[in-house]
Amino acid sequence: MKEQFNLIATAAAGLEAVVGREVRDLGYDCQVENGRVRFQGDVRAIIETNLWLRAADRIKIVVGSFPAKTFEELFQGVFALDWENYLPLGARFPISKAKCVKSKLHNEPSVQAISKKAVVKKLQKHYARPEGIPLMETGPEFKIEVSILKDVATVMIDTTGSSLFKRGYRTEKGGAPIKENMAAAILQLSNWYPDKPLIDPTCGSGTFCIEAAMIARKMAPGLRCSFAFEEWNWVSDRLIQEVRTEAAKKIDREIELDIMGCDIDARMVEIAKANAQAAGVAGDITFKQMRVQDLRSDKVNGVIISNPPYGERLSDDAGVTKLYAEMGQVFAPLKTWSKFILTSDEAFESKYGSPADKKRKLYNGTLKVDLYQYFGQRVKRQEVK
């Protein structure tokens, strides 16, 4: 088995730098590219990054890359890779995804079929199995992906399984919730730190508040999750347990937090409470049923983070316009507070009544959104009477 792997952490557009910082914080050098962060590591790195990365989507092993302008080149390129170092006899290895962009090969089902045939032939040769008899695929699953960009094929194995945004604490969700990894990334892009008050005035199922509490408490986001690699014979159960135990020991149970989530919908408030309970942070967050226009605070240097309803999520345009105007009026007196508002509404600033200090383009799934950033006038707390 291999001792070092070429690895990729995939990321939503606009979040690559956040994921890169997280990878470096774990001690791995990396290169940030569009939609991905490349790094190298051993089996422990595979476990740690799946367990700890908050903003990434998946961790993939790069088995190899090669030119592939024809199906013959694709077959020979896949066949030449060292599959015996990854796939034990009996493994299931579906070619779960093929993607062709700006390439001569563009029939994705054919790319999948030929890649599968090449892997089968390589394993038959390595394990001395007759070519005419199909391999028994009854063991652990290794999902293989083939990406062909500008006639260069990259072949990968997904180590994650269910996407990393599925933390395992969501009991229920609202109509269009923000993904957990997107919420964690926005918190890291904001100027919030655990010693500052945090309010989400349109909290829905509570994702921003829960992710903030998990960040503050140093809770590994994957601690409750299971991963594809846990079924693989060359990833030892002892090492997995060791990394999980180390992560559990890092949880900070002493820190005091000031996090509040509000929503006009009483049912969503109850869902948010249940989700926080499932995440183990119920005691860190105050959830209230409250309208945006009723929000007040005499605290300073806080942060407001909101993913309010917008056009694609709400059919009532007049209601959205009214909500944005109310936000502008209610947030204006909170001069020392920074505000971070995520919406796809390109007219948000005019409806809110103030231009943003900074705007950042992101994607919530396939939907293009902007993070409107308004920075507070920071003061020393003792200066405030």
Stretch-by-stretch model annotation:
Residues K2-F142, K385:
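Non-catalytic nucleic-acid substrate-recognition regions in nucleic-acid-modifying enzymes
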Residues E48, L53, S162-R167, T171, ...:
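Flexible, glycine-/basic-rich loop-and-beta segments that form/coincide
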Residues C100-S103, S162-S163, P309-R313:
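A short, flexible beta-alpha/helix-coil linker loop
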Residues I144-T160, Y372:
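C-terminal edge-of-domain segments
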Residues V155-L189:
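SAM-dependent Rossmann-like transferase core, predominantly class I methyltransferases
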Residues I178-R296, E312-R313, D317-G319:
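Conserved S-adenosyl-L-methionine
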Residues M290-K385:
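C-terminal catalytic and target-recognition region of SAM-dependent MTase-like enzymes
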